[in-house]
Amino acid sequence: MVKPIIAPSILASDFANLGCECHRVINSGAEWLHIDVMDGHFVPNITLGQPIVTSLRRAVPRSQEEEKASGEVARPTAFFDCHMMVEEPEKWVADFAKAGADQFTFHYEATKDPLSLVKLIKENGIKAACAIKPGTPVDVLFELAPYLDMALVMTVEPGFGGQKFMPDMMPKVEALRTKFPHMNIQVDGGLGKETIGVAAKAGANVIVAGTSVFTASDPHEVISFMKEEVRKELKAKHILGDETKH
């Protein structure tokens, strides 16, 4: 069983006020933060590295239990979903696990041995996910999926935010949902109120949304709308899980 998850992409946030921006979207209903890591090689853009994740983890702890143990005033908590658009992702696993990542999403196209990489990620105590670019066929994930915590179908070309959603990627989502009904399936790129219905109907339950959330005058309304669209489709497919569990 799966539940609706909205993961605002911090690539669309005001980096001068990153901690406050993250608190704002978490307080608006987001449980995950999507952290895009780009190296300028696998994709042409360069974004951020593990020092930012380390700093952000201090501002956004994993859980209230962790907060209570520290004795500090409770702050918003979130799951850190690190999307690694990098060459040789293997060499970054330990650093990002130490920095505070909860999930390490590598690109299928960036590694020669995806199964060994999944094992390495899990040995470092975090969740493992695999992403595919728009030009990569979905069936490359079928053998790997039983070992994954999540699959990511890119709905734009990776590397830059603010691109238009590619609806022709939805058959990939449908194929994954049919074969793996209880798996987290994420879509990333161009998601907002206008496109969420198509993605939800295809079977996506983890929605990366950047500009549509961070630039909204009312991010709570946007997040709530998208969650409800996903919830309706998961319920119709009889795979809606308990949303009180984290």
UniProtKB/Swiss-Prot annotation:
Top enzyme class: isomerase
Binding positions for a divalent metal cation per the UniProt entry: H34, D36, H83, D188
Domain of life: Eukaryota
InterPro entries per record: Aldolase_TIM (IPR013785), Ribul_P_3_epim (IPR026019), Ribul_P_3_epim-like (IPR000056), RibuloseP-bd_barrel (IPR011060)
EC number: 5.1.3.1
Keyword list, A-Z: Carbohydrate metabolism, Cobalt, Iron, Isomerase, Manganese, Metal-binding, Zinc
GO BP field: carbohydrate metabolic process; pentose-phosphate shunt
Record-level Gene Ontology MF annotations: D-ribulose-phosphate 3-epimerase activity; metal ion binding
Active site: D36 (proton acceptor), D188 (proton donor)
Reactions catalysed, as given in the entry: D-ribulose 5-phosphate = D-xylulose 5-phosphate
Co-factor remark: Binds 1 divalent metal cation per subunit. Active with Co(2+), Fe(2+), Mn(2+) and Zn(2+).
Cross-referenced Pfam families: Ribul_P_3_epim
Annotated positions binding substrate: S9, H83, G159, F160, G161, G162, D188, G189, G190, G210, T211, S212
Pathway membership, UniProt: Carbohydrate degradation; pentose phosphate pathway; D-xylulose 5-phosphate from D-ribulose 5-phosphate (non-oxidative stage): step 1/1
Essential cofactor(s): Co(2+); Fe(2+); Mn(2+); Zn(2+)
Purpose of the protein: Catalyzes the reversible epimerization of D-ribulose 5-phosphate to D-xylulose 5-phosphate.
Family: Belongs to the ribulose-phosphate 3-epimerase family.
Name this polypeptide is given: Ribulose-phosphate 3-epimerase
Gene name of the encoded protein: RPE1
